[in-house]
Each structure stands twice: as C-alpha cells, then as structure tokens.
A protein has these predicted regions:
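N-terminal metal-binding scaffold of metallo-dependent hydrolase/deaminase domains
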Residues: 1-42, 53
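Residues that scaffold the ATP/ADP-binding catalytic core of kinase and kinase-like folds
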Residues: 11, 34, 69-70, 83
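Flexible loop residues that form catalytic
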Residues: 11, 65, 125
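Generic anion/oxyanion-binding catalytic loop in active/binding sites
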Residues: 13, 44, 90, 94
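Alpha-helical scaffold segments that flank or form the walls of functional sites
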Residues: 25, 72-123, 127-143
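Short C-terminal domain-edge/linker segments immediately following a structured domain
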Residues: 32-39, 64, 78-79, 89-93
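Hydrophobic faces of well-ordered beta-strands that scaffold small-molecule active sites
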Residues: 58-62, 120-122, 145
C-alpha cells in the first residue's frame, strides 16, 4: 500500500524532515520507505491520495489514567491527596459498573483519537471486567496500548 501526501516528522529531537508530494510505502502497518514515483506495477487500488494534506505521526501518551477522564477540569483548588479523596476515588468506584465503564471509556478513546493520540500506556481501576473493556475497546478502535 502507498499513501501519497506531504509528510512532516522528526527523526530526532533537533531535526525536522519534510517530504513534499511523496509516496510512503506501507507494509504490515509500518512505513518501509518514501519515494517520489510509484513502481510501474502499482495499481490504483493500492494508493491512498492525501496529496492536499500534511501527514504527521500520531501522538503517544506514556502515562494516562483512563478513569480520570471524568475528572478533567475538577478540583484545581485542591492539593493531590484531597483531590484524590474528593474526586478520584469516588469516581473510580463507579467503574464497578461495566455499563458505566464502557460509556466513559468509549468517550475517553474517542477523545484521544480526535486529538491524534493513537498509542498509550493507560492505568485503569481495580475492576477487572471494566479494565478488560478498556483494552477491548482500544483494540477495536485501532489503538496500540
């Protein structure tokens, strides 16, 4: 498969690479190389054209608490321990209900996707069924976790 577009990425923290109007060759979900022209044997069904777009890598979040999604924006006036006691621990107790967990985790994952985060290392709760739901939803939505 080939993706045509304008690619922007950083091979190192002090280096920016721009590949304008090029093709990325993708094998098994991995970019194997870039080229300015397609091989002659390439059929149109193997090319996805984003030539009017800028393509950047997805973001990776290495430390995120999925159940705290429902706490976002709450308790800015609290120190850590009171915040945990007033907001986090009561909220995380609700994840004993798998229906509640599925609803929250679905919203959480959709938000990550919308912001370009497609890979993460997440903390869940002590509730085994709800934690499995998070991982199953993430896999079904195409995340790497």
């Amino acid at each position: 498969m080939f993706i045509k577009g304008n690619f922007l990425y950083t091979p190192s923290c002090h280096e920016l690479t721009i590949r304008e109007n090029q093709y990325a060759h993708i094998e098994n979900g991995v970019v194997t190389g870039f080229m300015t022209d397609l091989p002659e044997t390439t059929g149109p069904e193997t090319v996805v054209d984003y030539s009017q777009d800028i393509i950047i890598p997805a973001f990776v979040d290495l430390h995120i608490h999925a159940p705290q999604y429902i706490n976002r924006g709450l308790g800015f006036d609290e120190e850590l321990l009171p915040w945990l006691e007033h907001y986090t621990f009561p909220a995380e107790g609700k994840f004993a209900d798998p229906v509640f967990a599925r609803r929250v985790y679905t919203a959480f994952l959709k938000r990550l996707q919308a912001e370009g985060t497609l890979c993460f290392s997440a903390f869940a709760t002590i509730h085994k069924e709800s934690t499995w739901q998070l991982m199953e939803l993430a896999e079904a939505m195409g995340f790497k976790a």
